[in-house]
Design a protein with these regions (language model features):
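Outer-membrane beta-barrel translocator domains and adjoining extracellular loop/strand segments
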Residues: 42-48, 117-121, 149-155
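Outer-membrane beta-barrel "beta-signal"
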Residues: 30-31, 80-87, 153-165
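Cleavable N-terminal export/targeting peptides
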Residues: 1-27, 165
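C-terminal binding/interaction regions
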Residues: 140-142
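Hydrophobic core residues within well-ordered beta-strands of beta-rich domains
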Residues: 29, 50-52, 64, 79, ...
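Gram-negative (and chloroplast) outer-membrane scaffold detector with strong preference
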Residues: 22, 58-124, 129, 163
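A short, structured loop/turn motif at beta-sheet edges
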Residues: 130-134
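Short glycine/proline- and aromatic-enriched beta-strand/turn motifs that initiate or cap beta-hairpins
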Residues: 20-60, 64-66, 70, 110, ...
Length: 165
């Protein structure tokens, strides 16, 4: 319950901050879903888990977004709050060899696992592939560090779709 409260407060803070941010080119909001695979390292009751995740967020600038995620796995659930930073510098190199629909990003934040109450910092990388201006495929790889727990690190990979509105 403590983990849920902490992550809930973090998520509410991110959404409140996003509501006061300067409006980017579009409305700035997005939502999506993904299939997710979690690979824990170290000793724990956690095992390899497959499941799904739902994400929602808002762009504060053209490069920076804040998002929240809720994941339901086989025997666990997770909540996360993170910042997503898009790497627009590659545009200087001819859109990465002509792939103008490809959009790489870095992410950093916190994730909590409900089965044992652990919360830890997370970092990752990923990419969008834009199908249209409103729809994109999203691929992520993330590592979450376990603090004060037997699980040292939890790796996750996900693939899904995202809608910008």
């Amino acid at each position: 319950m403590k983990t849920a409260s902490i992550l809930g407060a973090a998520a509410a803070s991110l959404i409140a901050l996003a509501a006061w941010a300067e409006e980017p080119a579009g409305s700035g909001w997005y939502a999506g879903g993904a299939a997710q695979l979690v690979l824990p390292q170290g000793g724990s009751r956690m095992r390899r888990l497959g499941g799904g995740a739902a994400r929602a967020g808002r762009y504060l600038t053209d490069s920076l977004a804040l998002e929240c995620e809720a994941a339901r796995l086989e025997d666990s659930a997770a909540l996360a709050a993170r910042a997503v930073w898009h790497l627009h510098g590659w545009e200087e190199f001819d859109m990465l060899f002509g792939y103008e629909r490809f959009d790489p990003f870095l992410s950093a934040g916190a994730r909590g696992w409900m089965h044992d109450g652990q919360v830890g910092p997370s970092a990752g990388l990923g990419a969008f592939y834009y199908l249209t201006d409103d729809w994109a495929l999203r691929f992520d790889a993330e590592a979450t560090l376990g603090l004060d727990t037997r699980v040292e690190t939890v790796y996750s990979i996900s693939a899904g779709i995202q809608w910008f509105f």
